[in-house]
């Protein structure tokens, strides 16, 4: 007996430690609708409050990203890892706009500005699950976004940690499933991103 938490259905059962499938059948919906080939299926399996397995599939590029707790991460069957980037200098960072929380736009843009000035470049592809997968596999050095949903994060967050990266909420803790706020990357990039986010904490934390 399993539970399902999905963007299209919500909880089907809760309240115990049996496996919960956390599913986003189409991450990057706007891209899909407009014919932009950047979207994915994201599936995580949690036992209790920990995601134990995750898979992200890009049906256009035929990429499959997998992770299991304690066994590492793979990209199309080959082990993958985050980059060795020691900090934001020279880093390629991914992000997403706070389209679900317009009240965060001003603090987000302040954070964006500081990250932009500190790194090599920023990309906003429009599918958070793939942003996390690409961070895990070394295409991006880090990622940050406000107000994501559990199905956006479940598989990708596990991928990043199993690939040697660091994940946290905007305060540096582990409550990103509850808050929907994610900062991740190589250890050094994560630390630099978190430092910038915290500079503006009074602005976004009050919203």
Indicate residue ranges for each PLM-predicted region.
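Flexible, acidic active-site loops/lids enriched in D/E/S/T/G that coordinate Mg2+ and/or position polar
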Residues: 1-48, 55
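A short, glycine/Asx- and small/polar-enriched loop/turn
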Residues: 15-19, 88, 136-139, 177-179
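Conserved G/P- and acidic residue-centered "switch" motifs that form tight phosphate/ATP-binding loops
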Residues: 29, 58, 160
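Hydrophobic residues within well-ordered alpha-helices
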Residues: 133-136, 157-162
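Alpha-to-beta junction loops
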Residues: 137-142, 165-166
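Active-site neighborhoods of divalent-metal-dependent phosphate/nucleic-acid chemistry enzymes
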Residues: 141-150
